[in-house]
Amino acid sequence: MANFVLKAEKREDLGTGASRRLRRAGKIPAVIYGGEKEAVSVLLDHDKVLHSTEDKEFFSSEITLDIDGKQEKVIIKALQRHPYKVKLIHADFMRV
């Protein structure tokens, strides 16, 4: 079983315009929810996530998100892709 570790950063700037700016900068907006904690908006590096999705185990394995130095165990619940480009739009993660 593969061990997936992705670096993430909390994001304060929310909304459609902010998400578009992130995507142009090579980032993916994402949300982490579940458990007893509040939902957290984060951003991830597009190329690293896209490369991870090439491994089929990514979608069924536990993923470790390193959010500003703090480790969080999650699974991927949703991944939105661009209709015709090889580009990711948004990701939803659920805490384990």
UniProtKB/Swiss-Prot annotation:
Pfam families (alphabetical): Ribosomal_L25p
Keyword check for Nucleus: no
Note the superkingdom of the native organism. Answer: Bacteria
Q: What Gene Ontology cellular component terms go with this record?
A: cytosolic large ribosomal subunit
| Record keywords, A-Z | Ribonucleoprotein, Ribosomal protein, RNA-binding, rRNA-binding
Family statement? Belongs to the bacterial ribosomal protein bL25 family.
How does the annotation summarize its subunit structure?
Part of the 50S ribosomal subunit; part of the 5S rRNA/L5/L18/L25 subcomplex. Contacts the 5S rRNA. Binds to the 5S rRNA independently of L5 and L18.
This chain belongs to the protein called: Large ribosomal subunit protein bL25
Gene (name only): rplY
